[in-house]
Amino acid sequence: MLNPAFVIHSRPYRETSQLVEVFTQDSGRFTLVARGSRGPRSPLKGLLQPFTLLTLSWRGKGDLKNLAQVECPDHSLRLGGDRLFYGLYLNELVYYLLEAHTPFPEVFDAYARALMALADGETPELPLRRFEFLLLQALGYAVDFEYAADDDSPIQPELLYGFERELGFVACERAPDPRTLFLGAHLLAFAEGRFDTPPLLQAAKRFSRLALQPYLGKRQLKSRELFLKRRSSLG
């Protein structure tokens, strides 16, 4: 049975093979051995690329399984310029944050939608924020954007709220770190899944970084590093 999948990462293995990290719709993220895939006559040569929706099957009983069959029903999504780094960022989130061999079908679908939006020229910040928010939900991190964490009072649009990761949002006028302050109107928009203005997108980005940081720990995302290097080289 063939399963929809994306390649998240790959690296050489032995003389002509690859270790391929895949994200599948029904079985989650795991590593496959693609035997002989780097050989000069391999039908897999050039096929196991990121940002391409594949269908594949595997065999084996251990954690490290062998790629059995792969088909490419669709063309690769073209991510050029900065959008390539946004795609790599999505891949790193999947690779680092999703537990291996655990199905996350809703994350898979959101990942596919985000890639298509990037390839179609949509404003990058929008699909990235949508994906991050859904990913946080899938990881079990649920924050209430409608009620204050300290007294369960309804969030007021005109008030400022400080973000405390273990609690949620608490009304306050100032905080030691201004990055943790959010306007109530923005929180209510998040509750509705709205990121339709530049200020909302900026606030959503701040929240995502704060909420995802404990999951990422001290890892330095390569996509972010490469993105900054590209921007620096372009002046």
PLM feature spans:
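Non-catalytic alpha-helical scaffolds and adjoining flexible linkers that form interface surfaces
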Residues: M1-Q18, F23-G235
